[in-house]
Each structure stands twice: as C-alpha cells, then as structure tokens.
C-alpha cells in the first residue's frame, strides 16, 4: 500500500468537508509526524488514529533535515518541516495545501500533492 505523509491542514480540510471516512477508505496509508500529531491534532482530532492515521517518527538524520528546513525556508512552520522531512525519510509523497510547504517540497525534489491531488 502506498504511503502518503500529510500535513495537518489536509486532514482538517477533509474533516470540514465530511470526507475523512472516505479518505481512510482509499488504498493508501496516511501518516503524520508524531510531534505534529501531538502538537496540532491530538486535542481536537485524536480520533484520527482510530480511523487509520499512522504516526511516523523521524530518525536522527530526519530530525537534522527538519531543522535544516526550518532554517532554509521562511514560510513552512516547524511542524510542516517535520512532515517534509518524514516524506523524504520514507521516500514517499507529501500531501499539503500550504503554498510555502509545497514550494519547499518541490525545491527538495519531494513529490507533493494537494487535497484534490
């Protein structure tokens, strides 16, 4: 099953549209960085794990990459940079609707898609 790394905004947008069950019914595995989940999603969207959202951990090299991205790019948040680094670490596409994160992913040669693909 194809792994896709998501930022928080994609999941929140799909929740607002009432599309989360359909999302997790697709033949993909969805993950977010664990720190992003705990800081941005757990309190109000903790049930996402029950729907099938996975949590990904950055290894040492991935953490270094994430902090490098925070220094290198102005627009993406720290948690966005964790998602970017996790996509690189796992060698899989990144899902985001954030323009700054999309541009950073493109500069890092990481395949990036949006809500509507």
Predicted regions and their residues:
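Long, charge-dense
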Residues: 113-117
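Active-site-proximal, substrate-binding regions of enzyme catalytic domains
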Residues: 2-92, 99, 110
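Active-site-adjacent loops and short helices of periplasmic peptidoglycan-processing enzymes
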Residues: 102
């Amino acid at each position: 099953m194809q792994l896709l790394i998501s930022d928080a905004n994609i999941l929140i947008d799909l929740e607002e549209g009432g599309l989360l069950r359909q999302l997790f019914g697709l033949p993909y595995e969805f993950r977010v960085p664990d720190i992003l989940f705990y800081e941005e999603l757990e309190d109000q969207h903790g049930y996402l794990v029950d729907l099938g959202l996975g949590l990904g951990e950055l290894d040492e090299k991935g953490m270094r990459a994430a902090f490098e991205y925070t220094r290198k790019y102005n627009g993406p948040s720290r948690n966005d940079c964790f998602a970017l680094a996790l996509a690189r670490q796992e060698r899989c596409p990144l899902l985001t609707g954030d323009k700054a994160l999309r541009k950073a992913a493109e500069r890092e040669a990481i395949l990036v898609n949006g809500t509507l693909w």
